[in-house]
Amino acid sequence: MWEGYLNAVEEYIAEHDDVTARLVVDRFHVAQQYRDDFDTLRKQEMKRLKQELPPEVYAQDVKGTLWPLRKNHQDLDEEERIRLRRLFQYAPRLHQAYTLREELTAIFNRAQTMQQAERRLTSWISKVERLNATCFRPFVKTLSSHWTLIINYFADRVTSGFVEGLNNKIRTITRRCYGIRKPSTLFQRLWLDLEARLFTTPRRAFTLSTT
């Protein structure tokens, strides 16, 4: 979502008639921001509860809820759900924000048209404003600033996961090649390593039938 990068890509597309592309803000970068906003509130609420609750109550009902809070609700086991219910008794604002976060995640997980996504996101923003869920104000601002690019995700639901995974592999290989000075040698090593990974990856067998 860096403006400099987005502007550079837009300029390139505008200057090349043979390039047809749709700019998309990756959904995982979007999720990172609204989850960070939720986490900011979580820290504030944990600090408040530690000051207000008796130590034994805090230890029993609040401590140890970090990972259950960070997990998607559908991935929680029964024990984790019980822990969150106990926590939310003392932190209704956190419960409200948790529910809004899960509703937003559900929107991005749902297969739908761009128009449907627009309606659901608009409804979510209205709900945030109506409930005065101030922790999400930074995200709502980002959502408004990059509205079209975020909505574009729902056209094909494509993410940059493959590219980022490839970049991680390249960084790992580059660290192993410390001391290599010639760029051509480094690129040869990258090519050999990545090609080897492709050839050693188990592949599904296909049968071609002829009539």
For the regions a protein language model found, what residue spans apply to each?
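Acidic/histidine-rich catalytic cores and adjacent linkers
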Residues: W2-D18, F28-R35, Q51-T211
